[in-house]
Structures are given as structure tokens and as C-alpha cells.
Amino acid sequence: MPSPARKFEKRPTLDNLVEKVDAQRPGAITGDTIPTGYGSLDKLLGGGFRRRDLILLGGDVGSGKSALALGIALRVAQQSPGVAFLSGEMNEERLMERALAIEGRVAVDELRAATLTDQTRAGVGGAAVRLRGLPITFLPLAGEDFETVFERLDPLRQVGLVVVDYLQLVPPPRERTTQDEDTALVLRHLKALALNRQVALLVVAQLPGFNAARADQRPTLNDYGVLGAPKQHADVVLSIFREEMYNPGGGVDGATELLVSKNRNGPTGFVDLYFYRRWMRFEDMLDPDR
């Protein structure tokens, strides 16, 4: 005797997803996607970062990790999603100083020494006007434990992107026996934080396994160390490679490869950026629509 046909239950999540796809205009990005403001990167990532994703950004010392993280934060804020930027190395004044340099295309030392020309002063003035109304909040990455640090996000509303600079300064939820175990535990909790708060979480990371003496200095996933945790918990891994750091005078000043070493929901590869070191500003090297 044939068994009775199985009656499938309704799946509201599936139904909602299908409705969303049907309603989406061709080429439009989904509502949970947050463009980074760097067109070439957004194109490779299918529109940008996605809410609930954990994104790592690593690179050698002095490669511009914090500058790129701040540049992304500013560009996201200009598109209206709120941004929270937690820094373990700079207070709000120093971060705003860097933001003025990036947006005003002026060197930080000129800001500090007040040696601005009429042209750069005008650039700073215009940058100040743009920055004043941006929905970006700077917070200290300091506290006795993980929960204390991230409770500071509770009063914030409409936040789409949270930036943490940097991973190794985040206090672990509880003490483990080694630094690697602490960092792996922090990554697991950061991923849970992204899921629970429905934000894209961009985390700057040092590379404990990086060796600048090797033949190819492009960072790899193995350079992130920490018991393979990035491979397990990160949805996207971005790595900065600037050849001028290893080949000075080689005619490649400013040229930057931003490697997408892991992309859970799409392709890997790299995009070409240009780094204006005096301004700590990254720009797309090529038209992303080419």
C-alpha cells in the first residue's frame, strides 16, 4: 500500500526570499547589502558587504589597514547606513583628524602644524561640512571584557556597519591558555554579534604568520594564524598588498592589490586600488564597470 503523500509545511522564510527576488530590479542590490563605496570591490562582492557577515581586513604592518577601514566607514556613512567605529589605538579626536585628511585630501601633519594653504584650507572646510552630518560614531575599544566593550553599541540605532580596529585588542569573553585561543574565541563571539545585531562587522587584523622575507609577500589565509579561525568564522577575508613596501623605487608607488582571499557567498580574486599615502586615502585604480 503506497504511503500517503507528505504534506509540506509552509516556509515563510523561503516565501519571503522568493518574493524579494521577484520584486528586485535587474542589477539592484538586496536590502541587506551595504556598498563599501569602492566600486571595484563592491562589484567583486556582489554589491558590497552583507549584514550578519564577519569581514576580516589584514595586511603587513604599515600597509594602510586602519586607513582603508576608516575610508570604508566614511563611504558607507555617506550612503546613510549608520556606522560605529571602535578603535583601540586612537581616540575620537585622532580619528576625526584622519577623517578630515581623507576627505579633505590634506596631509595630517599639515593639519597638526596648521601649515595649510588657501587651497587645502578650503578642502578641509568642505570636508568638515560633509563630515559634520555623517551618521558615524567613534567609540573606544577598551574595557574589562568583551561584553563591556560591545554594550556601547546598545544606544545606537540604525547601524549597518560596525568596524573594529583591531582584532588583537578585543578583550576575550574569558581567559584561555594562549593568545591564539583568545583570538579564536573573540572571532566566534564577533560572528555571533554580527548575526544578533544584523550588522556587517569589519574587523582589522594583524597577521601573526606573515613573513616578509618570502618570495611572494601577498598575504594568505594561513598568515592570519589563530588556529584556522578565519577560515571557519569569517565570511569575507580581505588582505592589502602594496608592492612598494618590498620593492621601493620600483615605480609602483601607491599601487595596491586588495585581495579577496575568502568570500563565502561569491568569487575570490583581487581589485586594484591606489593609496595616496600623504592623505591616507585609498581610491579605485580602474573604472569598476570596465
Language model: regions and residue ranges:
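The Walker A/P-loop phosphate-binding site
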Residues: P2-V106, P288-D289
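Conserved H-loop
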Residues: G88-M90, V199, V204-Q206
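Cytosolic-facing regulatory segments adjacent to core modules
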Residues: K43, R75-Q158, P172-P173, V271-Y274
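C-terminal regions of RecA-like/P-loop NTPase motor modules
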Residues: R11, V61, F146-V162, H189-R197, ...
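Short, well-ordered beta-strand core segments
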Residues: V83, L201, V237-S239
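Helical hairpin unit composed of two closely spaced alpha helices linked by a short loop
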Residues: G160-V203
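Helical mechanochemical/support elements of P-loop NTPase systems and associated helical scaffolds
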Residues: T13, G37, L68-A69, N91-L95, ...
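Hydrophobic positions in the central parallel beta-sheet of the AAA+
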Residues: I55, T137, V162-V164
